[in-house]
């Protein structure tokens, strides 16, 4: 049934390539456990015991953290919902499967770091990827959107674009820095997969010496694993969007306007993007308590 499910997803124009790959990886993980257990799974096999073993397999054997596991189980549940919608009899134990999400540390760049990136002397290839990242910083969009900005989206002093992920419209002010970079490439970009783009951006940020060591905690059930990593390793395509939102907040841009520019529909989601300004925190707290 999973093969049929994946084939239908392939034929659906509404399913992105990245999402399709996630369904395939879940299927492969199930097949791997099936092989390890030397058994054959049927729809009725996916009971409480199976999910306990499957989650343990992903945590222990595949070293998948709880936050990633939660997303994977979400994709797996889509398969079972599809089964029910199509009249296939399946075990309903999946409905009670729940993985606790853990707070995740995300990076956004400071004003001076954005300026540092903009001023770096780089070779032609890295110069292009740096500029594309800065387009994300100046526009506040996801990589899937800021990498496809086009003149046809211009409406007066704004770029109006519908997000690929959510279908929501963003009204992006065509500020001088953004327009300068878009014009530099004649609004025409050669795209690479976001994972490869992240590697390029991390290389650039390493050159920029964003070397501050940060402790990252990952949870695997009740097990916590802490690891020290340089800050540049935590920077990726989505850091651009977080940076736009965080710097807009620090510049006192009203939240409602930031939401219109980014296509974000809820204040809760917006707050999740906004990173702590530790310098501002210290300044205000020292003023209050010293």
Regions from the PLM with identified roles:
Residues 43, 68, 106, 124-127, ...:
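Residue-level marker of regulatory loop/turn positions in helix-turn-helix DNA-binding domains and
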Residues 163-167, 262-287:
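Catalytic-site neighborhood detector that most strongly recognizes the C-terminal catalytic loop/helix
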Residues 103, 111, 139, 148-181:
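Conserved tyrosine-mediated DNA breakage-rejoining catalytic core shared by Y-recombinases
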Residues 66, 70, 85, 89-143, ...:
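Basic, Lys/Arg- and aromatic-enriched nucleic-acid-binding interface segment
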Residues 187-191, 202-260:
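Short, basic (Lys/Arg/His-rich) helix/loop patches that form interaction surfaces
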Residues 152-158, 234, 250-272:
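Short, polar N-cap/turn motifs at the start of nucleic acid-interacting alpha helices
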Residues 5-18, 27-105, 119-120:
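N-terminal core-binding DNA-recognition domain of tyrosine recombinases/integrases
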Residues 56, 67, 133, 144, ...:
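Residues within the helices of the helix-turn-helix
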């Amino acid at each position: 049934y999973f093969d049929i499910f994946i084939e239908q997803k392939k034929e659906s124009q509404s399913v992105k390539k990245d999402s399709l790959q996630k369904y395939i990886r879940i299927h492969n993980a199930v097949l791997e456990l099936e092989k390890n257990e030397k058994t054959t799974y049927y729809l009725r096999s996916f009971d409480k015991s199976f999910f306990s073993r499957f989650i343990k397999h992903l945590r222990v054997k595949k070293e998948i953290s709880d936050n990633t596991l939660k997303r994977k189980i979400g994709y797996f549940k889509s398969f079972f919902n599809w089964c029910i919608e199509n009249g296939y009899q399946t075990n309903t134990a999946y409905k009670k499967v729940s993985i606790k999400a853990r707070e995740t540390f995300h990076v956004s760049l400071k004003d001076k770091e954005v300026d540092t990136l903009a001023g770096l002397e780089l070779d032609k290839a890295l110069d292009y990827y740096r500029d594309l990242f800065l387009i994300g910083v100046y526009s506040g969009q996801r990589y899937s959107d800021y990498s496809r900005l086009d003149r046809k989206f211009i409406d007066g002093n704004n770029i109006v674009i519908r997000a690929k992920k959510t279908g929501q419209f963003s009204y992006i002010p065509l500020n001088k820095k953004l327009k300068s970079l878009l014009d530099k490439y004649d609004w025409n970009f050669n795209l690479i997969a976001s994972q490869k783009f992240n590697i390029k951006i991390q290389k650039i940020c390493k050159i920029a010496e964003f070397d501050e060591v940060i402790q990252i905690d990952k949870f695997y059930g009740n097990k916590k694993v802490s690891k020290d990593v340089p800050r540049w390793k935590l920077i990726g395509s989505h850091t651009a969007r977080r940076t736009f939102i965080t710097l807009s907040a620090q510049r006192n841009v009203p939240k409602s306007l930031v939401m219109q520019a980014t296509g974000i529909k809820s204040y809760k989601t917006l707050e999740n993007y906004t990173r702590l300004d530790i310098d501002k925190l210290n300044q205000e707290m020292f003023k209050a308590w010293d």
